[in-house]
UniProtKB/Swiss-Prot annotation:
Biological source species: Ruminiclostridium cellulolyticum (strain ATCC 35319 / DSM 5812 / JCM 6584 / H10)
Chain's gene name: proS
Chief location of this protein within or outside the cell: cytoplasm
UniProt enzyme class: ligase
Name of the protein in question: Proline--tRNA ligase
CC terms in the record's Gene Ontology section: aminoacyl-tRNA synthetase multienzyme complex; cytoplasm
Amino acid sequence: MAKDKKLVEEITSMNDDFGQWYTDVIKKAELVDYSSVRGCMVIKPYGYAIWENIQKSLDTRFKETGHENVYMPMFIPESLLLKEKEHVEGFAPEVAWVTHGGDEKLTERLCVRPTSETLFCEHYSNSIQSYRDLPKLYNQWCSVVRWEKTTRPFLRTLEFLWQEGHTAHATAEEAQEETIRMLNVYADVLENVLAIPVIKGRKTEKEKFAGAHATYTVESLMHDGKALQSGTSHNFGDGFAKAFDIQYTDKNNQLQYVHQTSWGVTTRLIGAIIMVHGDDSGLVLPPAIAPTQLVIIPVSQHKEGVLEKANELKQKLSAKFRVKMDDSDKMPGWKFSEYEMKGVPLRIEIGPKDIEKNQAVLVRRDNREKIFVSLDNLEETVVNTLADVQKSLLEKARELRDKKTYIAATLEEFDQIINSTPGFVKGMWCGERECEDLVKEKTGATARCMPLEQEQLSDKCMCCGKPAKSMVYWGKAY
């Protein structure tokens, strides 16, 4: 047992050093390994299995809303990238360039895609002629490259996996509907699959996506009180359409520009899961995305009938759940710590005494509760327990977020709150860029979003005292 305890103690306490705790967890839970290329990571099978389950949840919803998957090239000619000035200026510092093919210098540099708006626009300009071609509802699963200065696995890497949706519509109203529809899809997946509560809102002009008419976001709060932009949905209006000449003939035989949207989430969602639900023993995974939903641990497995019963339970439960049975020769205590580390939502212990009593012992990962259950009712109890774990994780995360959400009436009050008790701070804002910049300069916090559900906390801007236009969630962010 001393070894078991040491295993847990190898994780730095999140209260002592949250950053080191995060690093310890992703390494010891075998989610990633480091690469020889700075800022890149190897996503190991367990980490990738989490991403696959997130993918399935999203892809199902994309298809239910009429979207199709496509794939665009990895490379973008420099001339194509330069077509939308505001867009390229937003990404220029992060772009990786290909200058040679083999030994030959290319006549035109190729950008390794940081995002694919320009490629989709080129395709749409060639494939959309008539109103009958609309809407175009495309999504792409791929990796992108952004040459970040500071990196951390899952949260910010030079190359990362994501999905990017790109759609084209006949009217501004349809594009806006799509923008909000996909924002709601993200909120649904985050809350009902990942058990992460979100704030849905609109980004300020300063924080919006380069080239967008408007950017909407789902913001979540991590255990350390820092915000994480967990997904964005952009309304491009007809700006890209004009830059790339994407026109269609309407029902009156008149040429019109299309209206476009773009929306995406990345593998940083895995980082969010870790930082919202994890504890000092490791990962805590919501059952909906856990690669293994329950692990069966045979106790005194060398004794007659134990392994047979454990295998029988595995066969029975595998029809409904993602199940693993660990019959390795490691001690049960080591196994308990190992699967706690990996965040498996439910553990089933079965030993000789349990078999005699026709029972099993269930242990929840989220609250360590032990449940003694008759084998006759095992399947039903597992269903109900996993559902309760999923629900409890969301409730616990929401309680923490609400506890770490504050209100500030002045910049002085804001500064005191954000630097002593990190979290979301709600404050009124006049809408002026100068005040937004002042908040960043004085406190290091940024405007996370103007929530869709507004509150009138006061009628004055917390910075300048002028009439307020909107309530903003502010915070320090990853």
